[in-house]
Amino acid sequence: MEIAMSSQREIRLNAFDMNCVGHQSPGLWAHPRDRSWQYKDLEYWVDLARLLERGKFDGLFIADVLGIYDVLNGSGDAAIRQATQVPVNDPLALITPMALVTEHLGFGLTASLSFEHPYPFARRLSTLDHLTKGRVGWNIVTSYLESGARNIGQQTQTDHDTRYDYADEYLQVIYKLLEGSWEDGAVLRDRERKIFSDPRKIHPINHQGQFFSVPGIHLCEPSPQRTPVLYQAGASSRGKQFAAGHAECVFVAAPSKVLLKKTVADIRRRAVEAGGDPHSILIFNLQTVIVGDTDREAQAKWQEYKQYVSYEGALALLSGWTGIDFGQYQPDQVLKYLHTNAIQSAVEAFSTADPNRQWTVQALADWAGIGGFGPLVVGSAQTVADELQSWVEETDVDGFNLAYAVTHETFRDVVELLVPELQKRGVFKQEYREGTLREKLFGAGPRLAAPHPGASYRRDARTAASVEEKVT
């Protein structure tokens, strides 16, 4: 049953996690109540999925990297010591068992198109969409870690713009396989005539491009969504252009309302230029919330959590994300006096969050130590709800990807304290919509709709010969 929302804007929530220890909060795995070290146990993920569905989360957004953060001091040692997203397991295997214990929760799978050919990957997507009954999304990334490129035989990472040229063609192949290879009605399951599928309605895609040659048919029958919900997280100009053309949901990590408002407006403008509706794309900002029964209790939790942050682990993350070796600087060095383009770009972004702060290397590590680059909100459910509503109203963002400090504690506090407050205000759903993830998010049909480019690859079944003309 769907409950009517108030006239205020609905807030969307995803949980943000990764098949590793600590994810965005380096060092917090050592906290006595943290369970992230249990990432390799199915019970960890099953418990999380049940908790998130109880809290009516839209989905679980699962990050991934294929590589190690080895920029800090030119080595991966710090990342290894501090479990900074290593060890890390494959995210795909998590989805099916979590889908089995839930009915509505969506699953956003991060998978890099840099390291797997689209033909077998299309089969993985269809398989997951079948097994989840249409509750899967794909976060499209072009990998950025040099260590990942080297370990698959590339001497260096492909240059940025070429990666997006590659991505555009990769998506063409995916659309042709998932949308165009099998017509609606191709699967008959006709026991009397012993005909499972009509070959007249299944077509080779005959793709020949700059990067890929794929002549054959898709190996899977159409899944509930055909193409999973498409997420994208590119922050560059080219990445945002790619998102405007392909993504249905965009994940950003803006540390301030000023920067987020600019980013959201830019993405929506690009969506219009690509021929779409500016609000047809859902935009989620990275956010971490620490919620307590009172503001004082929440602040006490935050102070407790900060004692476990690993400075070395935070620098390993920051160095990997930015390409800057922060190990060459002292903790008290002021960033604005370090004259590199990459550092000045980082300073400019964080200065919008707190223009009066003296941004030293230590201050940047402290910021990123709980929840990564996104903003942190600490307080009672009422305080946090006020703040999240202000972000939505002032920036035009649709919702948040919530990172954790301590898991599952952070998410449990959101479910038990924050969600009821948001529901009371009429800005968060009381119940899920029925249907696939796409239907739950957008309230329309299960498949890509025009003018999305993927929809243009779908064949009109009415133009094809019927099975009666082919099979007797």
Residue ranges and their predicted role:
Residues M1-T472:
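N-terminal glycine-rich cofactor-binding segment that shapes the pocket for flavin-like pterin cofactors
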